[in-house]
Amino acid sequence: MRLARLLRGAALAGPGPGLRAAGFSRSFSSDSGSSPASERGVPGQVDFYARFSPSPLSMKQFLDFGSVNACEKTSFMFLRQELPVRLANIMKEISLLPDNLLRTPSVQLVQSWYIQSLQELLDFKDKSAEDAKAIYDFTDTVIRIRNRHNDVIPTMAQGVIEYKESFGVDPVTSQNVQYFLDRFYMSRISIRMLLNQHSLLFGGKGKGSPSHRKHIGSINPNCNVLEVIKDGYENARRLCDLYYINSPELELEELNAKSPGQPIQVVYVPSHLYHMVFELFKNAMRATMEHHANRGVYPPIQVHVTLGNEDLTVKMSDRGGGVPLRKIDRLFNYMYSTAPRPRVETSRAVPLAGFGYGLPISRLYAQYFQGDLKLYSLEGYGTDAVIYIKALSTDSIERLPVYNKAAWKHYNTNHEADDWCVPSREPKDMTTFRSA
């Protein structure tokens, strides 16, 4: 807790003036006022690196770097600066969480992982890119950090659950936690993307895998969208058959408006797309099976895939009864789930419904490269889930949270009551307003 208190104290001071000026050089030298060496301890290191904005990369940049004479030295020089910046930016926001949430064992564990990873990366800040042993050790460190952060999502989720069960959550805290988790998990996705790219390109393992031979790290330059959708459907179907002894069929159609008659392919991370469609299939299957439980006949899940000049769109339609409009936003709330929460020790088993994180995390995966995920529901009939992905790799640019004055203000501003009238539950008695 001592480190947590120190980091929190530094965060409460707010971001320094002028830290986000346009054209601020990513040069950790005298032009930034101080250097990591002059900062003492973890709080000083976090403060220093949080002064820099993360550098978002486009899918094309990821692709070009990995496919044209991939250079481990170049990756080393970029990551040893960029990873501390991304870690430090989100660590500042962790420190702004409510004290009681910071004290939960799960959040303390997550915080310790981030501190340890930052310190390990900073060991390489003065190493030469010409030092072969330093490059080798750095790749090992990247893989170790990636493995350390494997359970960040369920561990942070458990911390929030512990906090809610012990202290409850008022509307302001709930709003701040929702805001934080969106940014924290988006940061985690981006950090893992960098770690995966380096470890897959230079880690030495998996390079010869036939199924991934044409991949650039975790990116498939010719990702066959229908194949990923079918894979997600089959795996969700196995779970559905296990739970309900039956499952709805899949009706899949594609329309390539850009190149008629050709299969739809896009530069993308297949694991991200798989995560999204797998979660949507689980939700659609569960809703369909439960809504039609007494009928014994289960309508198929329809999926339409279209590729235009700007967007790749995947629309999944079910006849699972839908949800009321007032509940749509709740479906993207991290603490909302219509199914019982699994026990922590079984959270890795990927049940058909669980923490309630499937939809919000899936939306973050879509938004990570400037896409989106939206729900449109017809209560009593069914739901359409629509995934939007950028069709061009040059438009697919990382969406990254940055710790600045706007973010700091969000955590430290009291959110006033809504500025729209709240309707009463009972009709107003207009007789009291009759004129004499």
UniProtKB/Swiss-Prot annotation:
GO molecular function, one term: ATP binding
Reactions catalysed according to its record: L-seryl-[pyruvate dehydrogenase E1 alpha subunit] + ATP = O-phospho-L-seryl-[pyruvate dehydrogenase E1 alpha subunit] + ADP + H(+)
Enzyme class at the top of the EC tree: transferase
Subcellular location: Mitochondrion matrix
Domain of life the protein comes from: Eukaryota
Annotated keywords: ATP-binding, Kinase, Mitochondrion, Nucleotide-binding, Phosphoprotein, Transferase, Transit peptide
Phosphotyrosine PTM sites in chain numbering: Y136, Y243, Y244
Expression sites by tissue: Expressed predominantly in the heart. Detected at lower levels in liver, skeletal muscle and pancreas.
Binding locations of ATP: 279-286, 318, 337-338, 354-359
Stored InterPro entries: AK/P_DHK_N_sf, BCDHK/PDK_N, BCKD/PDK, HATPase_C_sf, His_kinase_dom
Modifications the protein undergoes after translation, according to the UniProt entry: Phosphorylated by constitutively activated ABL1, FGFR1, FLT3 and JAK2 (in vitro), and this may also occur in cancer cells that express constitutively activated ABL1, FGFR1, FLT3 and JAK2. Phosphorylation at Tyr-243 and Tyr-244 strongly increases kinase activity, while phosphorylation at Tyr-136 has a lesser effect. Phosphorylated under hypoxic conditions at Thr-338 by phosphoglycerate kinase PGK1 which has an activating effect.
Alphabetical list of Pfam families matching this protein: BCDHK_Adom3, HATPase_c
Chain ranges of the Histidine kinase domain: 163-393
Phosphothreonine: residues carrying this PTM: T338
Protein's GO biological process: cell population proliferation; glucose metabolic process; hypoxia-inducible factor-1alpha signaling pathway; intrinsic apoptotic signaling pathway in response to oxidative stress; regulation of acetyl-CoA biosynthetic process from pyruvate; regulation of glucose metabolic process
N6-succinyllysine carried by residues: K405
Inducing stimuli: Up-regulated via the HIF1A signaling pathway in response to hypoxia.
Location, primary (coarse class): mitochondrion
PROSITE patterns per UniProt: HIS_KIN (PS50109)
PANTHER family in UniProt: [PYRUVATE DEHYDROGENASE (ACETYL-TRANSFERRING)] KINASE ISOZYME 1, MITOCHONDRIAL, PYRUVATE DEHYDROGENASE KINASE
Family assignment from sequence similarity: Belongs to the PDK/BCKDK protein kinase family.
The protein's role, per its UniProt record: Kinase that plays a key role in regulation of glucose and fatty acid metabolism and homeostasis via phosphorylation of the pyruvate dehydrogenase subunits PDHA1 and PDHA2. This inhibits pyruvate dehydrogenase activity, and thereby regulates metabolite flux through the tricarboxylic acid cycle, down-regulates aerobic respiration and inhibits the formation of acetyl-coenzyme A from pyruvate. Plays an important role in cellular responses to hypoxia and is important for cell proliferation under hypoxia.
Subunit field text: Homodimer, and heterodimer with PDK2. Interacts with the pyruvate dehydrogenase complex subunit DLAT, and is part of the multimeric pyruvate dehydrogenase complex that contains multiple copies of pyruvate dehydrogenase (E1), dihydrolipoamide acetyltransferase (DLAT, E2) and lipoamide dehydrogenase (DLD, E3). Interacts with phosphoglycerate kinase PGK1; the interaction is direct, occurs under hypoxic conditions and leads to PDK1-mediated inhibition of pyruvate dehydrogenase complex activity.
Additional remark text: Exposure of cancer cells to severe hypoxia induces translocation of AKT to the mitochondrion, leading to AKT-mediated phosphorylation of PDK1 at Thr-346 which supports tumor cell survival and proliferation during hypoxia.
Protein name: [Pyruvate dehydrogenase (acetyl-transferring)] kinase isozyme 1, mitochondrial
